């Protein structure tokens, strides 16, 4: 017995006459009404089984029950995604609001932080996604525009909060926020009374940031002409000379440098002789005590993995910030790579020197900070040697930085 041919239109229109099925085909598991909807007795699980069975038996996927099921599933998935994204947005907003308020409370110097706030701060900072640590570092950095000199209460709140975040950064290998906090350690300070030293140690300067900056200032003055020559007359030479220490020179031109200039302008006979660690004037007004002096023991400072990662990030940011081809729209990075192919040899040499100068300046800053945190000279030299090779520094640049480490280590 031959099976009658079924017009194609019947399959598409689903007319009242269903195509004759093969004797081997099993009947549909769920009967349908004339309008294509499922019977009243069908459950949700039966709906899923029906859709799967019909699809396996080769029926058209445009079947009404399949379309309804697919639309329902798609709507549920879209609704679920929207709900998840909405929840995540709310959590992110709550985290940012908390960190903003927490940092503002630290710098206000007013009411103390209660235990609930401290516990919530610790919870946010220990999260695996690192958002709490990131936003804390951002808001602390943003406070620099107000003042770098803080009250004693604010200072010790910062010490406690930094210790929590830096410990979690070390545990999670989260080096981005730690790099920003490292910079803040040399930014915020309070004026405190100097500690009286034993008579035998009064000849030796205290290990404050001022002593480090004095030493670096002296070293910088001696080597400025050499460093200027090393910058090799690139198009950005003036800019590089101005900041060839990647921010160190800015520190040197701060209040300490201005104070030194004022001292130099005074008559010679009125200048006090520096025979003790602190002059009477310094004892009256106190000295600058920076955050790093209380955070030297943080384990993250004592691993080269942090310094290597932080240095790479700092060099990348500096190149992006100071390179005319990448300043502005981030989409110009690809255009820069395309331009490289069309550069003359002289332009390529200038570009390479520009990158070398950035590496040289950042290495000066990083080795200075490493020594200030109490890292030994060998570790600093190992770091310098590795990064000098990667950055393609020449022998004279390498010797300048090695001499800098040697001089700072003896202070």
UniProtKB/Swiss-Prot annotation:
Tissue specificity comment: Widely expressed, highest levels in cerebellum, brain cortex, hippocampus, pons, putamen and amygdala. Highly expressed in neurons, but also present in glial cells. Slightly higher expression in the dorsolateral prefrontal cortex of schizophrenic patients compared to control individuals.
The protein, known as: Uncharacterized protein KIAA0513
Cellular location(s): Cytoplasm
Taxonomic path: Eukaryota, Metazoa, Chordata, Craniata, Vertebrata
Modification Phosphoserine occurs at: 279
GO cellular component, one term: cytoplasm
Residues passing through the membrane, by range: none
This protein's record includes keyword Cytoplasm: yes
Top-level lineage group: Eukaryota
Gene: KIAA0513
Main localization of the protein described in the UniProt heading: cytoplasm
UniProt keyword Phosphoprotein, yes or no: yes
Basic and acidic residues bias locations: 258-272
Coiled-coil ranges from the UniProt annotation: none
Listed Acidic residues bias regions: 46-57
Compositionally biased intervals (Low complexity): 74-86
Keyword list, A-Z: Cytoplasm, Phosphoprotein
Region of interest (Disordered), ranges: 1-91, 253-280
PANTHER family for the chain: SIMILAR TO RIKEN CDNA 6430548M08 (PTHR13663:SF2)
InterPro entries (alphabetical): KIAA0513
């Amino acid at each position: 017995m031959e099976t009658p041919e079924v017009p194609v239109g019947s399959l598409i229109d689903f007319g009242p006459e269903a195509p004759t099925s093969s004797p081997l085909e099993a009947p549909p598991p769920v009967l349908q009404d004339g309008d294509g909807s499922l019977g009243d007795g069908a459950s949700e699980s039966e709906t899923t089984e029906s859709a799967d069975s019909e699809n396996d038996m080769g029926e058209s996927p445009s079947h009404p029950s399949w379309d309804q099921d697919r639309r329902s599933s798609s709507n549920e998935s879209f609704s679920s995604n929207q709900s998840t994204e909405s929840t995540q947005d709310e959590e992110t907003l709550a985290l940012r609001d908390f960190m903003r308020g927490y940092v503002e409370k630290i710098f206000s110097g007013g009411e103390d932080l209660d235990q609930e706030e401290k516990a919530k701060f610790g919870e946010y900072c220990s999260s695996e996604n690192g958002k709490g640590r990131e936003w804390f570092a951002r808001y602390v950095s943003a406070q620099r525009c107000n003042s770098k000199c803080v009250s004693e209460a604010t200072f010790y709140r910062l010490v406690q909060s930094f210790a929590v975040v830096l410990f979690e950064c070390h545990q999670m290998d989260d080096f981005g926020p730690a790099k920003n906090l490292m910079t803040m350690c040399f930014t915020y300070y309070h004026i405190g009374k100097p500690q009286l030293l034993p008579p035998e140690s009064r000849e030796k300067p205290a290990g404050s940031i001022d002593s480090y900056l004095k030493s670096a200032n002296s070293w910088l003055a001696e080597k400025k002409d050499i460093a200027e020559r090393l910058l090799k007359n690139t198009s950005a030479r003036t800019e590089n000379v101005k900041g060839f220490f990647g921010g160190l020179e800015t520190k040197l031109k701060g209040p300490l440098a201005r104070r030194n200039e004022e001292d130099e302008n005074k008559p010679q006979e009125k200048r006090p002789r520096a025979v003790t660690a602190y002059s009477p004037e310094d004892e009256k007004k106190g000295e600058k005590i920076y955050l790093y002096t209380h955070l030297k023991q943080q384990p993250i400072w004592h691993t080269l993995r942090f310094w290597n990662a932080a240095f790479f990030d700092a060099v990348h940011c500096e190149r992006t910030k100071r390179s005319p081809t990448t300043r502005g729209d981030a989409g110009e990075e690809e255009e820069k790579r395309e331009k490289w192919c069309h550069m003359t040899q002289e332009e390529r040499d200038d570009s390479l020197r520009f990158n070398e100068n950035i590496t040289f300046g950042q290495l000066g800053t990083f080795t200075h900070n490493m020594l200030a945190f109490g890292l030994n000279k060998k570790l600093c030299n190992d770091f310098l040697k590795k990064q000098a090779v990667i950055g393609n520094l020449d022998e004279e640049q390498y010797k300048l930085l090695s001499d800098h480490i040697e001089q700072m280590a003896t202070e």
